[in-house]
Amino acid sequence: MNKPIKNIVIVGGGTAGWMAASYLVRALQQQANITLIESAAIPRIGVGEATIPSLQKVFFDFLGIPEREWMPQVNGAFKAAIKFVNWRKSPDPSRDDHFYHLFGNVPNCDGVPLTHYWLRKREQGFQQPMEYACYPQPGALDGKLAPCLSDGTRQMSHAWHFDAHLVADFLKRWAVERGVNRVVDEVVDVRLNNRGYISNLLTKEGRTLEADLFIDCSGMRGLLINQALKEPFIDMSDYLLCDSAVASAVPNDDARDGVEPYTSSIAMNSGWTWKIPMLGRFGSGYVFSSHFTSRDQATADFLKLWGLSDNQPLNQIKFRVGRNKRAWVNNCVSIGLSSCFLEPLESTGIYFIYAALYQLVKHFPDTSFDPRLSDAFNAEIVHMFDDCRDFVQAHYFTTSRDDTPFWLANRHDLRLSDAIKEKVQRYKAGLPLTTTSFDDSTYYETFDYEFKNFWLNGNYYCIFAGLGMLPDRSLPLLQHRPESIEKAEAMFASIRREAERLRTSLPTNYDYLRSLRDGDAGLSRGQRGPKLAAQESL
């Protein structure tokens, strides 16, 4: 009988490292010795973080930590959508150019997505944007309202914004209390045995750290996976052009301006800027391509966008786009930035961490390190990353913006996968892009199924229709279904009524978050309102 894994060393703290330590100490029921080594000298990347809705279910619920416990400690706020600004046309102060990417799938009527009925109406002169017609949430988002009633009853599916450093610190305390050994030191050498497996690590202060399994959370350095084990990193800069960012925390007058319950993505001349609102401030960063603008010009554009002074503290980031050929090599598993990186346009960074941890536990080895387990794990990570890469890329090559060289290059010069080409053609023909049921309650029963079918028809519809790319024609079948069309009209009317109910019953996001911070809100005791349009989903 092969020996079980008894000792695990995690290299790197930050969000990835402490999420890994917390998840593994819980998953292995404290039956393995877990040591995390982090250096006080190596800075952690992160200026505000946006997430997706499955974070609570897959990660925090697994740890047994309710939303109301962790949110106040990490300056947590709600995210009910992503708002895309100026992605269709160059900025014009006289014009409001935005669309929302909402959570939840598109409703259907007699087996046909409501978007097809909306398109038919649009062909007849209907002007309301798709997401405003097919979802009840946008009006509440425009009003900066919370996704919950004052008593904590949830009315809209949501994800979260938070300070990633505070999350790492929160999880550090949680993990150490449960037996994780924290070492503040720096790895200076990685020793391999004659099989090419990592045997131990040498540290700056003279320690020798031995383990059966090593988790590389060292960030883009890839200290173990790339530097020591020489696993190649597959560069995908021909799929996505942005390679740099300038970021900062920006003060916000919440009482005057409110706190937006969504992430904003504001298109710029050579990239886009994120805005992640929290109480008292928002995290923001300009993601740009160094091939189309200089760092100095990008910094100037970023400061001008928010009216900031030249002495504003800034975080300059250079990133690699792509993934390791294999995320798991021998007895080393890379998690987080050491495994892969995709620009945060759809808030996938934290998801990549806990999805990889979920898959690691599902494929957890013993000391024989059966290659069938690592091969299966690696295939899952390739699927996860490439699928998300295609979805993010779809935001760029389907836009109609052509006012700068950057946007022209995105429309004409990107390398496209066969999978995304096929999705575009299916969308233009009016066909479904994914095979999932339109019933969210069955779709989201297990994370395994969500992982395999991450981006739904509704996600693609929001982006494609939002950017102005529509199917070639409304579904021909609807010409033969007058009764279905009548039913769809009733559904549109019901959505309008629900939108009005949300608009008139929800507190402002600022008031709700302030009550949560002060301990007054009945926040999220697992309650869901009867009108909730979608489960914890994308």
From Swiss-Prot:
Binding site for 7-chloro-L-tryptophan: 79, 346, 443-444, 450, 454
Residues under site feature: Role in guiding and activating HOCl: 79
Domain of life from the UniProt record: Bacteria
GO biological process: antibiotic biosynthetic process
Substitution effect: residue 274 to A: No change in halogenase activity
Pfam families: Trp_halogenase (PF04820)
Effect listed in the UniProt record for changing residue 79 to A: Loss of halogenase activity
Catalytic activity: L-tryptophan + FADH2 + chloride + O2 = 7-chloro-L-tryptophan + FAD + 2 H2O
Gene Ontology molecular function: monooxygenase activity; nucleotide binding
Residues of the active site: 79
EC primary class: oxidoreductase
Pathway participation: Antibiotic biosynthesis
Site annotation Important for activity: residues: 346
Keyword tags: Antibiotic biosynthesis, FAD, Flavoprotein, Nucleotide-binding, Oxidoreductase
Entry's transmembrane regions: none
Phenotype when the gene is knocked out: Cells lacking this gene lose the ability to produce pyrrolnitrin.
Enzyme Commission (EC) number: 1.14.19.9
Chain sites annotated for binding chloride: 348-349
Residues engaged in binding L-tryptophan: 346, 443-444, 450, 454
Similarity section: Belongs to the flavin-dependent halogenase family. Bacterial tryptophan halogenase subfamily.
Role played: Involved in the biosynthesis of the antifungal antibiotic pyrrolnitrin. Catalyzes the chlorination of tryptophan (Trp) at C7 position to yield 7-chloro-L-tryptophan (7-CLT).
Note: The reaction between FADH(2), Cl(-) and O(2) produces hypochlorous acid (HOCl), a powerful oxidant. Unlike the mechanism proposed for the tryptophan 7-halogenase RebH (AC Q8KHZ8), which suggests the formation of a chloramine intermediate with a conserved lysine, HOCl is proposed to be a direct halogenation reagent, with the conserved lysine that may hydrogen bond to HOCl to enhance the electrophilicity of the chlorine species and for its correct positioning for incorporation into the 7-position.
Subunit architecture: Homodimer.
Name recorded for this polypeptide: Tryptophan 7-halogenase PrnA
Species name: Pseudomonas fluorescens
